[in-house]
Swiss-Prot record:
Full protein name: Multiple inositol polyphosphate phosphatase 1
Region (Disordered): 66-102, 380-425, 614-635
Record field: transmembrane: 566-586
GO molecular function: 3-phytase activity; acid phosphatase activity; bisphosphoglycerate 3-phosphatase activity; inositol phosphate phosphatase activity; inositol-hexakisphosphate phosphatase activity
Organism encoding this protein: Dictyostelium discoideum
Residue ranges with Low complexity bias: 67-99, 380-421, 614-624
Length: 635
């Protein structure tokens, strides 16, 4: 009996020991899981998902879904929120039955505009990061031990690859294209690649060109004939940096550039006012966390650099326990609003010029759709009513090649006109630019527009519930896609769907997400008709140089250039002839005058010895002095 009791006690002890081991293992696993969540410090009252969704234009690409940050709603029209996904794996399409096109509608053309993917810091940012820690180095002995890594910190971003696209940025575009292909297989699969059916353009910057390559590779993977994997090479067209009015309008509109540098038209003060309000408190908090209260306070520039260093560490290496560990949740939200104020007033709704300069891009998109519709006017009874607000003028003639040129080329390479029996193939227009491309273009469409303008002294409620957030509007690889559908009947005609970051959005002025194409065009018709690139963007220029077809599409520029070419072709030869004639006459009379002076001197010095008198004439002739090639008369 005693033996049995002893055995039972031993079993209970063993069971208890195993339970403790299991508990310790579970605790260890939980602790490890917490550590894997980014080694967040106690002051980091947020998780990595929050952090990676509030880095303004340094934010990794979002996958837009219905579950996520309630403060990140778009323009208020979709009613959907967002959740983050930075995975390099292929993600499922965010389809929803309510967002499916009407059953009778067929996708016939796509125009896709995207920002480049995640990148390295640009050179200027790298230089600032190198100087960031210099003011704190002398306080090494006083800094809290948890931050000793600061004194061994070196900027991990090589200057020779500054601004380059990183692998994550390539995957962002690769995965977007895969989801697009999965969403519309019937549109893409029958369409073999050729430059006439795929117009792919980027700015003349490597990160946008490589983004275009990554997107194209995902979209066309395995469809080519090159190599064992069926690689399909593509043609990517670029325009020179100083002439690209479609994707770099922010740099080629002289009026806008001048206002940014010197003008008072664009408000630059709101961000400064906000920083003056919140940065002193952030400075005190950072100093306290470092253990340097009353010893060292980071300046406004150092604070900005710390935020930027945090953003790059998250977006490039997913590191949160270095510079981000100095920042609380409220610090990050305050910095995010600081950046939003800058982008709002310099690139968005702060002033009309910020987004009106994106008009040529919108006009080029609609012109391309119109050309496609008019060349396929057998497909819908409503197509005969479709025409561009500028009769299909193609803005691609100045700057990046546009959709109009792409679609017309597919059937007009020989210069002949299309007839109704020869339909143009479906066309994909893919464009790759920058945050400065996306933000103004989204603003031109009226998306993410707050009822009241954003100011440094806006109410807390307005700041917290604002629609305009660059973390949502323009993260890395942000995109706007326009889908043209042929719905096949006079009642429905053609419809257009606009998506921002793969989520359908309701454009203000449209009755529904699948907006009637004519209605969509009418919303922007006046703005397109009234916008003249030359008169709007060229400083001290008037409308006379851009009259005619300059409806925001660059044709006025082209027309002006042609007129200048004709003028110069006539003026230069005439000037040369007149100038040469006058020069010859001047040289001749100068020569005669010099000879006369020389002869007078000789006559005075030698009498008439140099002259030969003619017995039959009272006039005199003389032996001319040979011209010296070194004479000052011959230059």
């Amino acid at each position: 009996m005693m033996v049995k009791i002893k055995n039972i006690i031993i079993l209970f002890c063993i069971f208890g020991l195993l339970s403790n081991v299991s508990s310790l293992s579970s605790s260890s696993s939980s602790s490890q899981s917490s550590d894997n969540n980014g080694n967040l410090s106690p002051i980091q009252d947020y998780d990595l998902e929050f952090l990676s969704k509030h880095l303004t234009t340094k934010t990794p690409y979002w996958i837009l879904t219905k579950n996520g940050d309630s403060n990140s709603q778009g323009d208020g029209s979709s009613g959907n929120s967002n959740s983050n996904s930075n995975s390099n794996s292929n993600s499922n399409s965010n389809s929803d039955s309510s967002n499916e096109p009407p059953e009778q509608c067929k996708l016939i053309s796509i125009d896709f505009i995207a920002r480049h993917g995640s990148r390295m810091p640009v050179l200027n940012s790298i230089e600032k990061l190198k100087e960031m820690t210099t003011s704190i180095l002398e306080y090494k002995e006083q800094v809290n031990q948890g931050f000793n890594w600061i004194f061994n910190y070196s900027v991990p971003y090589p200057s020779d690859i500054a601004g380059n696209l990183i692998l994550q940025g390539q995957y962002e575009h690769y995965n977007i294209s895969k989801r697009l292909l999965k969403k519309y297989p019937l549109f893409f699969e029958p369409m073999k690649y050729k430059p006439q059916s795929y117009s792919i353009t980027s700015t003349a910057i490597s990160r946008t060109g490589i983004s275009a390559s990554a997107f194209s590779y995902g979209l066309l993977q395995g469809t080519g004939s090159l190599g064992v994997d069926g690689f399909q090479p593509v043609f990517i067209e670029t325009a020179s940096l100083d002439q690209d009015i479609l994707l770099r309008f922010f740099a080629t509109c002289n009026q806008y550039v001048d206002q940014l540098k010197n003008g008072t038209l664009i408000n630059k003060d709101e961000q400064t006012k906000w920083n003056q309000m919140v940065f002193p408190n952030i400075s005190n908090e950072i100093s306290e966390r470092l253990g340097l209260s009353d010893i060292w306070l980071p300046t406004s520039n150092v604070i900005s650099d710390i935020f930027e260093a945090c953003a790059y560490e998250i977006s490039i290496n997913n590191i949160s326990d270095h510079w981000c560990s100095l920042l609380s949740k409220q610090n990050i939200l305050d910095w995010e609003y600081s950046q939003d104020l800058s982008n709002y007033w310099l690139k968005s709704y702060g002033h009309e010029i910020n987004y009106q300069i994106a008009t040529p891009l919108l006009n080029d998109i609609l012109s391309g759709f119109d050309i496609y519709i008019n060349n396929n006017n057998n497909g819908s009874s409503s197509s005969s009513s479709s025409s561009s607000s500028n009769n299909g003028d193609n803005s691609g003639s100045n700057g990046s090649s546009g959709s109009g040129s792409s679609t017309s080329t597919s059937s007009n390479d020989n210069g002949s006109t299309n007839n109704n029996d020869n339909k143009v193939e479906p066309t994909s227009i893919l464009r790759f630019g920058h945050a400065e491309t996306i933000i103004p273009f989204i603003s031109l469409l009226g998306l993410y527009k707050d009822e009241q303008k954003l100011f440094a002294n806006s109410s807390t409620e307005q700041i917290e519930n604002r629609k305009f957030r660059t973390s949502v509007v323009s993260p890395y690889a942000s995109n706007i896609a326009m889908f043209l559908f042929d719905c096949g009947s006079a009642a429905d005609g053609f419809k257009i769907l606009v998506q921002h970051n793969e989520l359908p959005v309701l454009v203000p002025g449209c009755d529904e997400i699948y907006c009637d194409y004519q209605q969509f065009k009418s919303i922007f018709k006046q703005g397109i008709d009234n916008f003249k690139w030359n008169s709007y963007c060229n400083i001290n220029d008037d409308d006379s140089g851009s009259s005619g077809g300059d409806s925001g599409n660059g044709n006025g520029n082209d027309s002006h250039s042609k007129k200048s070419s004709y003028f110069l072709a006539i003026f230069i030869p005439i000037t040369f002839l007149v100038g040469g004639t006058i020069g010859g006459i001047f040289t001749y009379f100068s020569y005669e005058k010099i000879m006369q002076v020389k002869n007078r001197k000789k006559l005075t010095q030698y009498g008439n010895d140099e002259f030969i008198s003619s017995p039959k004439s009272k006039s005199f002739s003389f032996k001319p002095t040979k011209f010296d090639s070194r004479s000052p008369l011959i230059q």
